[in-house]
A protein has these predicted regions:
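N-terminal beta-strand-loop-alpha-helix module at the start
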Residues: 1-40
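Short, glycine-/Ser/Thr-/acidic-enriched flexible segments
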Residues: 2-3, 66, 335-336
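Well-ordered alpha-helical segments embedded in enzymatic catalytic cores
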Residues: 20-23, 46, 308
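Beta-rich nucleic-acid/ligand-interaction surfaces
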Residues: 36-38, 42-49, 343-347
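Short His-Asn-centered micro-motif
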Residues: 38-41, 61-64, 81, 227, ...
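Beta-rich, aromatic/charged-enriched effector core domains that present basic-aromatic interfaces
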Residues: 43-180
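Glycine/tryptophan-enriched, flexible segments
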Residues: 116-257
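Active-site-proximal binding-pocket segments
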Residues: 220, 225, 230-347
Length: 347
């Protein structure tokens, strides 16, 4: 409960995490597992209550995704097991980094390709080229374009309604409307939809933005990867299979796999390599408060004449989501140019 009460969470984000957890507990019970899902003031309080009641010989858990989470698990004496939510463990990243003078994503990405075998012919890329980024910068098509297929939607049920009733009043943002799946089955359906209907045109338009579509040709799969409803290996396997079957051009397959095994895993590895000092790094000395444009009340419009910023923030309010170009090129760039304190942006 302390986690929920500690910040003003977006209503859809809080619902997504809690509903996914409760639905997973239901699925595990149906599969015959004994599940102890309890509400507690804090993770530590819930852990202590569980241990006091069940007296386990060993408590084991998948490695947390944060430095603080891992530190807490170690203090509690929890046996940690490697997470399968990343294909390159941070210890493997550290071994790759070694005493390199530079840690570039492209070098890491090529090492990952060779190690994992995606889009490879032996030790070389299948087409002789590692990177198709120069072909993946097309602007969005004009108004005559019929549009991109809408991602599947989920129907809210009693579990969803109970989660929403349990959320604190200070949550903000639009109510959940089925945009985000909260089950393994729903996440897999969205993966199949993306690979079949969207991936073929993902590459050329992966850096595009438009006011006519919030998702364009983006996968909209990152929430499921981040929470563990999908695993990076199965996502990349699906893309590899589609390429092998001739259903997806190389620029789209390579561009997507680069996002997953390249950028996503590179940033993950850098985080663990440089923590805990990384949390306080502020090389540019940015110390200004969050610009008012980033904050808004329900039903109001961000105060700005910059349509790109307004469109991105509308999407954050309506869906708790912004794709990678919106985060990097618009919202992140605005924070950089305005000298916003990194922690103010994070909170």
């Amino acid at each position: 409960r302390a986690k929920l009460d500690g910040k003003r969470w977006h209503r859809q984000r809080a619902h997504f995490v809690i509903a996914s957890m409760r639905r997973f507990a239901e699925e595990m019970r149906s599969a015959g597992f004994e599940v102890d899902l309890r509400r507690a003031p804090s993770l530590r309080a819930g852990f202590d209550a569980h241990v006091s009641e069940h007296r386990p010989d060993v408590v084991s858990a998948t490695e947390p995704a944060s430095w603080d989470g891992r530190a807490l698990m170690e203090r509690l004496g929890v046996e940690l097991r490697r997470s399968d939510q990343f294909l390159c463990h941070y210890e493997d990243f550290a071994e790759w980094a070694g005493d390199r003078k530079r840690l570039t994503m492209e070098d890491f990405y090529r090492w990952q390709r060779r190690r994992l075998g995606y889009l490879m012919d032996g030790d070389e890329p299948v087409t002789g080229r590692w990177n198709y980024d120069d072909e993946n910068r097309e602007p969005p098509p004009g108004a005559e374009h019929p549009g991109w297929p809408e991602p599947p939607r989920s129907r809210l049920d009693d579990l969803d309604r109970q989660v929403l009733a349990d959320l604190p009043d200070h949550c903000w943002g639009a109510e959940p409307d089925g945009t985000w799946a909260t089950s393994r089955r729903g996440a897999l359906a969205r993966l199949r939809h993306f690979v079949e209907h969207v991936l073929p045109v993902f590459g050329p338009h992966e850096d595009a933005m438009t006011t006519r579509s919030w998702h364009l040709a983006h996968s909209v799969l990152s929430p499921y990867l981040n929470i563990g409803l999908l695993l990076p290996g199965e996502v990349c396997d699906a893309v590899q299979d589609a390429y092998d079957a001739g259903r997806v051009p190389i620029a789209s397959a390579e561009g997507f796999i680069r996002q997953v095994i390249g950028w996503r895993e590179y940033v993950w590895g850098v985080y663990w390599r440089w923590m805990p000092e990384y949390r306080s790094a502020n090389e540019l000395g940015a110390d200004r408060p969050l610009p008012p444009v980033f904050t808004r009340d329900a039903g109001t419009t961000p105060v700005t004449e910059m349509r790109c910023v307004r469109t991105c923030l509308d999407g954050v309010h309506e869906r708790a989501y912004a794709h990678h170009i919106q985060r990097l090129m618009v919202l992140g760039n605005l924070a950089l140019l305005s000298g916003t304190d990194p922690w103010a942006m994070t909170d």
